[in-house]
């Protein structure tokens, strides 16, 4: 679909569904552009979203800032014009700001640790270079698997009983070492230090099989691996072709019978000689997702095998074992029966989180409470602490993609979805729904431009212009991405989190990390006058509730990686609180329009077509 306005002419996707939808069968999934630099392969061997394909294309064939004139016509871009698409192409598009040329850019220097990354008095060019590490210090592809893994650190120090939540971030290449000291790379998770691996199951959306195999220790690379995916037709054939060289890999296709659904769950089941571990996380199984993004991980304890003749069911107070078994059963897939049996043979009683899953289908009656936002609602009604009388505890949602939510907030966001997030134990009269603030965190154009990856980071933030134009009302809820607490302000989030903080943001009533973005496809939407919940996708997350830890509320940890005298029950929120509302010139990142007014941290522009 070609569009032309004062911004120039470009091609945009015709899809208005912002979930990470795989390309249609007749579209190629690989790029054949010549390699522009180290760290990026010449072509994508795995199937991915259109936004990610564009990001890959721009990484290997970048449009430099001084090349922009050859890409777009010489026309001044209006910063506040309601005509055309009505979108500013940069979040720093002040007409009074002098044009930036390559000659004006000072020599690049290492970024300094700052509380506020950018200052309004600094020119665009200076802001870009201040945050861009020298090319010589950027990890190269040949080494980065080692550099970003935690090899050499004492992993057991990280997994000690002093961390009751077992909630981690992935390691990020290009930030200070102290911010990676208690973070995990996939190689750490698969390390022999965690157990002697017998077999594993990898549930995910996007797979680079060759890369994945290299993340396993050499001694485990020939052990059985089950890949659970949602690919169809040519995408499925591509995945099978990737897996064909590996005799130990088998595949299981998740059924997706409702249009626009995806298999978005990200989970590892790891069977060891010593027991079983469950890992629920937010990263695709591709290099880019474990390199310079903010991602979340929950690690289960090592679950021991139940002794024969023992009368224990191995169930936890959170019913995690039953819920995980129910989730796997919902696939109705024979290859998963073996894993259901394995789970039944292990003792999961030490689990202190609740499982929140989504599975495709239409659910009525009591079945409606099993999945999606109604599952969250049911758990909060049963276990969430009631807020003190007279206090209005806000809701925070943070995500990397946004679906079509309707023409106004009443259609889904501030009706059924907010009702679920507001649920508490039935004690006292809660504040009116409209009085509860809703803070939504989604990266701005400026967040993406000044990120470690630069504009290509936006390939993992697939909010389209078609969807955005239909729901401008939503953007008044948006807050910037800022994560000084974890050193990840410049590592764009692919993590998804939802929580209920106190009015001063010092306490939490609950915290959820999940694969579910802000969409009806992920969370479900009511049909048939509210009697039926329809869900399109598979999703999975874990809910932290204070009652499961013997607490009334969680205290918010002041610094994510601090090991100071803060109480062990302080919860490590991975981004800054309170979140900062978009300013008048901030715009949400939209992947399929160009950004040519200012270069990113690599000196490049974003021209998606």
Swiss-Prot record:
UniProt keywords, alphabetically: Cytoplasm, DNA damage, DNA repair, Exonuclease, Hydrolase, Nuclease, Nucleus, Phosphoprotein, Repeat
Superkingdom as given in the UniProt entry: Eukaryota
InterPro entries linked: Tdp1
Region annotated Interaction with DNA, chain positions: 401-404
UniProt tissue specificity: Ubiquitous.
Biased composition (Polar residues): 1-12
GO molecular function, one term: exonuclease activity
Residues bearing the modification Phosphothreonine: 148
GO cellular-component term (any): nucleus
Protein name: Tyrosyl-DNA phosphodiesterase 1
Gene: Tdp1
